[in-house]
Structures are given as structure tokens and as C-alpha cells.
Amino acid sequence: MKLEKKFWGASFLLLLVSALVYLPKVASFGYYNDDWYVMFDAHVQGVKAFYEIWRIDRPGRTLLMAPLYNLFGMDPLPYHITAYLFRFLGGMSLLGTLRMLFPKRFFFATVASILFTIYPGFLSQVNAIDFQSHILGLFLALLSIELTVKAILAPSPKTRVLFTIGSILLGWAYLSQMEYFIGLEVFRLAIVLMLVLRGKGKSFKENFTTTLLRWLPFAAAPGGFLIWRLFIFETDRRATDIGAQVGQLFSSPLVGLWWLVHLIQDMINVLLVAWGYPLYTIAYQMRLSDTLIGFGMAAFVVLIVVVGLYWGKDDDVEREATSNHGWMREEYWLGLLTIIGGLLPVILVNRHIVFPGFSRYALPASVGVAILLAAIIEQLYSRSLRMALVGFLVAVSVMTHHA
């Protein structure tokens, strides 16, 4: 009962923090960048314009935008509200997943979900129309993975089957929105492996076989999508033609080396650069009054986070849960593998994370970034230092999104 209370407390904290970060100025938001041409085409041609725009590379996006346009029309505000809700729900799905994997780790799960939800490396939240599919896709991916964990941990076969079916369907749904999010399947596989390895006394062969058998039903999501994408769907856009992009590896031996270099660069970008450079490039454009408001908002949100973390603390339980070095390795490897998995599809189609213009490519990897940073911070012995680091990262995020 106490753990359930903590979960709902963490959920409320996530809701409060994310609302303070994304909603204060939402009523004044309009169309930005590619939002303009998307909405102009829809205004002139109706919902069929969405099909014409995305039929060449991501036709599934029409399944989202057509109903939203029928509901909201040309008014930008509802799109910004739904973009925020999908962002928050993505954070909730990550929180739910980490809660099941580490039920006694309130600090770790809460900090990871907050850092993910307000991650400063994604700078296109205000492009709520063009990036609606990105944000929804990320939420659906994390919800699919949450159902995977529920299926594996479910006590009854019937419940396990229902969660498995739901997970597969959501897997197809998120891939229909954004194909390069497929890197999050590494997160799913890493979780399955982690749960299998918690069973002691098994050989490598037994662990490998068990992992494969437990993961295989969920492989229907990426497997089915790849069959459709590679052998059935015909794309007219080279940038999203998987075969053409990966085929470059065989045209020159240097391509693979450059991919490795870009992977290392982008790992540094999502882990370190995202917490400084975007704010640095944007903040200097603000007026003094906006800067002061940003500092005030950042201080207020940090205060709320610190109070919330102190409310949920249980030193004895947390210390006991983190004393096992195996669990520590679990979190580090889970975060690191998720970062690599999130970046690989981006690298393989010859894209690169550049702030602020191509910050969207950091979205899948941001899941691993949040997990890894939360795990590192949690291991610090000094509670004051832990809170200071969390406060700093939250403040940077608040200031970046405010700017």
C-alpha cells in the first residue's frame, strides 16, 4: 500500500512539473515552421491533404492527424494541449515501467521519469502539429514496453496473453508514426534480458534460450513492421528508404567508420551537450524580463521537485535496494544500451543530432539518458549532492523550454 501511494505521489509530481514546464504560455502558441504548410494544405484541400503529404514516407501519420483536424480544425491550441498530454503520458509509461522493474526505488524511478519528460534536448515541443506524431509515437512505444513488462510479470496466462497482444498492437502503432523509433526495441529486449538474468543459477545457454523465447512474441511488432516497410511499402523519399541508406555501407568501407564516429558524437550530444548547448544558444536571445521570469520559474519547479523527492524518501529501503551492485549494473547497462539503440537507426540512415535544428533525433535516446543519469545520481552517497544535481538538471530543462 505504501509503494502504491508513492507511485501516485510520483505521478502527481510528474504532472505538476511537466505542466509548469510546458503549459504556462500555451495559450499564446501558434503555428511554427512546418506547421504552417501542413495546416495551409489541410485548409485548402481538407483531410486528404495529410495523405498526400505523408503517403511517400509515413502514411500512418494520416491516421493521427486526420481525426485531430476533424476535431480541432485550424485552432492551434488543442494541438498544443494534446502534444503536452502525450508527452506527459510518455513520462507516466516510463515511470510505470521502472516502478515494476525497481519497485523500491522511488528516487530513481521518479527522477528518471522527470528528466525524460522535460528533457532539454528536444526543442520542437512547440511545433505541436508537425511533431504531434513524434510525441505520440514515443508515448505509444513506452506504453508498449510497459505492457511487455506487465505480460512477463503477469501471474495468469490469460492476462499474459492480453498484455502481449496489447504490446504488439501498440508496437505497430508507434512504428506507423515514426520508423526510426524502432531503436527503442533495444530497450524492450534489454528489459527482457534483465528480468531473465535475475533468475540465479542458470547457465549462459539457458539464459539465452529463455530470453529469446520470452522476447519472441514481442518481436512481432518490429518484425512485422520491417517486413511491410522493406518488402511491401514503396517509398519515394530516399531519406526514409531503409534499404538505400543501409546499402551505403557496402559502397565504401569508410561509411561504417563514420557511423561509429557519429554514434560516439551523438552519445556525447544526448548525454552532455543537451544539458548546456541548447540553453546557451537560445537564452541570449531573451529579454531581461523573460530571463528573470525563467529563473523564477526554474527555482519554483526545482523547489517542487526537491520537496516531492523528500516526501517520498525512505532511506532504509532505498539504501537496501541500491546496496546490490548487480542492480547498479542493471541500471547503467539498461540506460547505455537504450541510448545506443535509440541512436543507431538515426546513424544508419545517415542523420546526425544537431541542436537545435535536428533535436528530434534525440527523442528515443532520451529514455536511456534519463535512466543512466538517474542511476548515477542515485548512487551518490551525499543526499545534498543528489538533490543539487537533480535541481541543476531540472533548472536547465525549465530554462531551456522557457527560452
Language model features with spans:
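Polytopic membrane enzymes that build or remodel cell-surface glycoconjugates and lipids
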Residues: M1-A403
